[in-house]
């Protein structure tokens, strides 16, 4: 049974909105006071340990476990949770949008269903709900379905073939990207399954004027880190032995004991390095790296196979390539302060005037963390941690800071925030970036 942590919203109160009390002040155990408004109350689940790579991403509902419901200001509601057959919940997931007495079923018997974004501007001209659905447990990939949140909701776009999808304003420049991978194109490639790979080819997408564009080349530092990580796992001996093989590594190939598994790992990492170059828009560097590391006798075959696989994947669904914005031309999204509560000042605030909060604060969609393992980790997890989060306009955590006089940091909790999902803050009906305080403690 999953354990959970309870979280309490942390808010600064002030006599007026100009109060600038330090955000770094130590935070004691939080209790709601009469008249004080909390940003939100959340629960953080401890995930059961798993070795399955495909389950490394957090989703709202997996095999009938987990649920989420929310309503947008237009009256359109979303529900993701266990599918119901009569009065019974099943081991599959359902997702639906509803408005008034109408209902739009997105999936009613899926292995996984998830809300990635809700009320977010993806560049399609309307606030949207982005849901991802995996139809069966044996399938490799998700379908990413984007619906308008105007009544009645309309399916605006579907992207197929990624193992996961995650919308985020990565650089806090006001533009939202969709991070995914080209998993469907490489599933079974060279007899390698997705669970054999460290990662499928990463991709970064972005909508502009309704067109789905490839923005991967704008995030080359991300790809460079992936390349460096894979190169660090290879030795000169590994590469030399692989270069002297036939490249195919067919089961019937005569190799010394232990070599097939080792060379298979080398082959996998060489492919991952080449993919990172190719998918980040550096084809010349990719083909050069392939020639340096792949057996010469098999080079033409593998190059043709890579090209053939790419045209079957997400690349075939794109409308073009995003044009990078120069560093000097980039906007910087305003980060609204959700740590201050504006309250009436006795004797100064006119009667009948209610102070207005600058933003509608974020609300959690999904917050999960892996279980602590060691005694020290368990002790840290049982104590309250106070976090300062910056949440972007797509509802993803862009930065996290542990507040207070803490001796040790719960590293597992901090790391897990990278996969947390929120309905973003809103200002004047528009999704915005915000910063909030969040107190997290073990639910008792």
Language model features: what each stretch is:
Residues 89-93, 137-145, 187-203:
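Structural motif
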Residues 94-108, 145-161, 206-214:
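Surface-exposed loop/turn elements that mediate protein-protein interactions on large endomembrane-trafficking
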Residues 327-444:
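Charge-biased low-complexity segments
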Residues 1-32:
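N-terminal secretory signal peptides that target proteins for export/translocation
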Residues 54-77, 81-84, 180-332:
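Acidic, small-residue rich beta-repeat scaffolds with periodic aromatic anchors
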Residues 112-119, 161-169:
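Repeated scaffold domains used in trafficking and secretory/extracellular systems
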Residues 120-132, 136, 169-179, 429:
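Acidic, glycine-anchored loop motifs typical of Ca2+
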Residues 35-49:
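Bacterial N-terminal signal peptides
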């Amino acid at each position: 049974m999953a354990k959970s942590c309870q979280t309490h919203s942390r808010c600064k109160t002030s006599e007026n909105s100009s109060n600038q009390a330090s955000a770094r002040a130590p935070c004691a155990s939080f209790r709601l006071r009469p008249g004080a408004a909390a940003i939100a109350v959340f629960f953080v689940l401890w995930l059961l340990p798993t070795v399955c790579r495909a389950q490394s991403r957090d989703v709202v509902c997996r095999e009938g476990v987990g649920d989420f419901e929310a309503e947008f200001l237009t009256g359109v509601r979303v529900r993701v949770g266990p599918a119901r057959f009569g009065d019974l919940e099943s081991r599959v997931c359902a997702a639906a949008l509803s408005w008034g007495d109408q209902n739009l079923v997105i999936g009613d018997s899926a292995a996984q269903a998830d809300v990635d974004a809700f009320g977010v501007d993806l560049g399609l001209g309307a606030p949207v709900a982005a849901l991802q659905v995996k139809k069966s447990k044996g399938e490799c990939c998700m379908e990413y379905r984007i619906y308008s949140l105007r009544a009645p909701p309309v399916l605006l776009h579907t992207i197929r073939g990624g193992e996961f999808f995650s919308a985020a304003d990565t650089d806090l420049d006001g533009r939202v990207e969709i991070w995914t991978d080209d998993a469907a194109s490489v599933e079974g490639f060279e007899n390698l399954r997705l669970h054999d790979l460290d990662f499928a080819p990463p991709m970064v997408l972005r909508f502009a004027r309704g067109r789905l564009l490839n923005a991967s080349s704008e995030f080359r530092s991300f790809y460079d880190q992936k390349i460096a990580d894979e190169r660090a796992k290879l030795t000169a001996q590994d590469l030399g032995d692989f270069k002297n093989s036939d490249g195919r590594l067919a089961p019937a190939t005569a190799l010394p004991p232990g070599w097939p598994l080792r060379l298979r790992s080398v082959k996998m990492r060489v492919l991952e390095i080449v993919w990172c170059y190719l998918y980040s828009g550096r084809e010349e560097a990719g083909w050069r790296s392939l020639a340096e590391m792949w057996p010469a006798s098999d080079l033409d075959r593998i190059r043709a196979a890579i090209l053939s696989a790419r045209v079957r994947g997400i690349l075939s669904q794109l409308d073009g390539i995003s044009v990078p914005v120069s560093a000097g031309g980039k906007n910087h999204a305003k980060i609204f302060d959700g740590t201050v509560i504006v309250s009436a000042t006795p004797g100064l605030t006119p009667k009948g005037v209610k102070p207005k909060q600058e933003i509608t604060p974020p609300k959690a969609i999904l917050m999960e963390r892996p279980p602590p393992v060691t005694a020290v980790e368990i002790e840290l997890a049982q104590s309250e941690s106070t976090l300062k989060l910056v949440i972007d306009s797509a509802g993803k955590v862009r930065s996290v800071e542990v507040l207070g006089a803490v001796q040790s940091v719960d590293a597992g909790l901090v790391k897990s925030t990278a996969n947390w999902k929120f309905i973003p803050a809103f200002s004047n009906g528009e999704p915005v970036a915000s910063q909030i305080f969040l107190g997290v403690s073990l639910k008792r």
